[in-house]
Amino acid sequence: MKAIIIGDIVGKPGRSVLSETLKRLKDRYEAEFVVANAENAAAGAGVIPRVGEEILSAGVDVMTSGNHIYDKKEVIQYIEKEPRLLRPANYAPETPGRGLWLGSTDSGTPVAVINLQGRIFMPPSDCQFRTADRLISEIGARASVIIVDHHAEATSEKYALGRYLDGRVSVVVGTHTHVQTADEQVLPGGTAYISDLGMTGPHNSIIGVESSLVINRFLRGMPTRFETATGDARLNGIVVEVDERTGKAVSIERLQVKSASS
């Protein structure tokens, strides 16, 4: 099976380019499953119900997230009732939502999606390595195709988890930095890996934010209200092919698609 995995959707520009391009990409690659990180989808920080539904309607099957998941209070009730929106599984058990989705594609291929968060230069959370162990054991034979979104800052930490899970999951992707890396590969054990998917949003910006606002904060050191940039919207991500019988990745390809209106 082929899956498309999409980097952090940032604000309205990100949602617009997603809606514009995803169906075409699914047709081109014959992809039957789509995962997208949605933690910046509502005005650049967080998710609200209307935005979540917009992303699902565009053709996304599962939404992952990270440290901005609770930036909008409206998400609390939504994440409790919408199993297709994940929060990091290594958050405290009492935290609203869940970090594992287990289901199947339209053709019946069982798929699991795990959402994890890094701990280096990030808010406190439980160990993502041990959390992954527990969830893989919980999934067991119910799904051979397992996709992991590791929302983390440090590349070394991302690589470490990729190597740690090599051969036990199908795909490990990094998110969070909004900068697409060029290290896509199939690891020796058969796990597809990339350090960061990049950003689906306005690339005429500083990682999605209006450039002048970020520069002003660096120059003056004063608090500045960030606003999502506009223009040059692009979709970043990967398309990965997985042998659904073995759960091993066959190939991984980077995606960077510009909006026709940019």
Task: Describe the role of every protein-language-model region.
Residues 1-262:
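Acidic, metal/ion-coordinating pockets
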